[in-house]
Amino acid sequence: MSLREICSQELVEFKGNKRGIIVNIKREAPFEEIQEKIINKLEAYVGFFNGAKISKINSDCLTDMEILELKEGITSRFDVEFVEDQKIEENSNFPTKYVNTLRSGENIEFEGDVVILNDMKPGSKVLSKSNTVVMGDINAGAKVVAGGNVFVMGKIEGFVHAGAEGNEFAYVVAGNLNPKILQIADNIAEAPDDEENYESESEISPEIAFVSNGRIVIESYLSKLDK
């Protein structure tokens, strides 16, 4: 890997598994920069991470003391819990389906919540009667249909339908909303042809789409939280 490729690599990546959120430090950087990136991501998605469980911080460059300092800084500012040293009891009555990888052409259909732990490949499809969370991107050609809300950590370039059973109070949140078609209940919107490309990591500002006065409105997620 060239120096340019290393420098352009995303510094902090959030993934997930059945135990909780995994924070991956992708390359070496000063501790203060790593801490700032993690805090910024948590603040950007504060509504999603409130009450979340973080199972691990993966890093080849941080010392044990620095990781401990990161944990203390995170728990002092956010309603999150580190659970790597605890046993998480699984409740079979809690209707959530976790999917590690959704391959091209693969379909998932579930009555409860669905959590996709990686990107959705073109041709993949999720049908959920409740909420759907995607820890990566919904790529062009992928499709999500949810009876409830849809929350995406990355970008949306595929088809998303929230409130599929007629719930006009449903909403869609994503790091970047650029879907081929976005539908909430019976309201449909298509992205304009001149939609800007996916923003760089430093410019990410999560967006929320919801129905207002019979049409789909897209606003900054953070400004919506402040209202």
From Swiss-Prot:
<dbReference type="InterPro" id="IPR016098">
    <property type="entry name" value="CAP/MinC_C"/>
</dbReference>
<dbReference type="InterPro" id="IPR013033">
    <property type="entry name" value="MinC"/>
</dbReference>
<keyword id="KW-0717">Septation</keyword>
<comment type="subunit">
    <text>Interacts with MinD and FtsZ.</text>
</comment>
<dbReference type="InterPro" id="IPR036145">
    <property type="entry name" value="MinC_C_sf"/>
</dbReference>
<dbReference type="GO" id="GO:1901891">
    <property type="term" value="P:regulation of cell septum assembly"/>
</dbReference>
<keyword id="KW-0132">Cell division</keyword>
<comment type="similarity">
    <text>Belongs to the MinC family.</text>
</comment>
<comment type="function">
    <text>Cell division inhibitor that blocks the formation of polar Z ring septums. Rapidly oscillates between the poles of the cell to destabilize FtsZ filaments that have formed before they mature into polar Z rings. Prevents FtsZ polymerization.</text>
</comment>
<protein>
    <recommendedName>
        <fullName>Probable septum site-determining protein MinC</fullName>
    </recommendedName>
</protein>
<dbReference type="InterPro" id="IPR005526">
    <property type="entry name" value="Septum_form_inhib_MinC_C"/>
</dbReference>
<keyword id="KW-0131">Cell cycle</keyword>
<dbReference type="GO" id="GO:0000917">
    <property type="term" value="P:division septum assembly"/>
</dbReference>
<dbReference type="GO" id="GO:0000902">
    <property type="term" value="P:cell morphogenesis"/>
</dbReference>
<dbReference type="Pfam" id="PF03775">
    <property type="entry name" value="MinC_C"/>
</dbReference>
